[in-house]
Design a protein with these regions (language model features):
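N-terminal glycine-/serine-/threonine-rich beta1-alpha1-beta2 phosphate-ribose binding loop
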Residues: 1-114, 136-140
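A general structural signal for well-ordered alpha-helical segments in protein cores
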Residues: 27, 61, 131, 157, ...
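Short glycine-enriched loops at secondary-structure junctions
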Residues: 101-102, 124-125, 178-181
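Short helix/strand-capping hinge loops at secondary-structure junctions
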Residues: 115-117, 121-123
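Structural detector of well-ordered beta-strand residues that form the stable sheet scaffold
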Residues: 119, 144-146, 176
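Rossmann-like NAD(P)(H) cofactor-binding subdomain of soluble oxidoreductases
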Residues: 123, 146-152
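Rossmann-fold NAD(P)-binding glycine/threonine-rich loop
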Residues: 124-144
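Predominantly a Rossmann-like dinucleotide-binding segment in NAD(P)-dependent oxidoreductases
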Residues: 151-234
Length: 239
């Protein structure tokens, strides 16, 4: 049996963006960590606190502060066009990026340049050249830079990997998936997030990651089809 580490440490988190992804994933996580902390016998107890957030207007941060009702320690809210720069400079240890996709690269780059570890919601960036730059920057500064795929925690995703790990699912020749959703989702709920996206970065990243998560990257080809005129003009990008 390994020895128990009784050391107590702390991590200060920064949050970029406080929209739907924050509400559904990060908010409950930070509230649970505030109540219970993080513990494992090999690294001991870690107090993880949300200490800085960055948003464009500050409205969501103010509303969350009001509704938190003691479930979270107080945090500093930065707003405006330079909110990310000020948040990553606020003495945090790591930053979580959950802003609209076309802002991921700048926020992640600022975090790494400031010496912060980075967690980025999928898709990490919208251009592979940007990903190369972030990877190089993280390696140069010896920092963690990871992409979050929240759907890997879905029961069906975990079940599929379990079938592979248990040797019940041995080989797959072909797989097929489709996305059917009302136009109101992309034109309304996700309207701000749609800028610069394509079918690959919008949702296919989930399925590609599921294959990687399940089969360990043994993927040969990916093909994607779409329709024009769904999100944009009929002669624009394919969706």
């Amino acid at each position: 049996m390994s020895a128990v580490n009784t050391q107590r440490n702390s991590l200060r988190a920064g949050m970029i963006g406080m929209g739907m992804i924050f509400d559904e994933t990060y908010r409950p996580m930070f509230q649970a960590l505030h109540a219970e902390g993080l513990y494992r016998r090999d690294f001991g107890y870690v107090d993880v606190a949300l200490t800085a957030v960055a948003t464009r207007t500050g409205a969501r941060a103010r509303a969350y502060k009001k509704s938190a009702d003691g479930r979270l320690a107080d945090f500093t809210s930065f707003e405006g066009t330079d909110s990310v720069e000020r948040a990553v400079a606020a003495g945090i240890d790591f930053v979580c990026v959950a802003s609209p996709d076309d802002r991921h690269f700048d926020a992640a780059k600022q975090g790494l340049q400031a010496g912060r570890h980075v967690l980025i919601e999928k898709p990490s960036v919208l251009q592979l050249q940007q990903l190369d730059e972030l990877v190089a920057l993280a390696r140069d500064k010896n920092l963690l830079a990871k992409v979050v795929y929240h759907k890997l925690c879905d029961p069906d995703h975990k079940k599929l990997r379990t079938l592979v790990e248990d040797g019940e699912l041995l080989h797959v020749n072909n797989g097929y998936c489709s996305l059917l959703e009302p136009r109101s989702i992309s034109k309304g709920q996700f309207a701000e997030w749609i800028a610069g996206r394509n079918p690959g970065t919008y949702v296919a990243v989930h399925y590609i990651k599921l294959i990687d998560f399940t089969f360990g990257g043994r993927l040969k080809t990916v093909a994607c089809t779409g329709q024009r005129g769904i999100v944009g003009p009929a002669d624009g990008n394919t969706w």
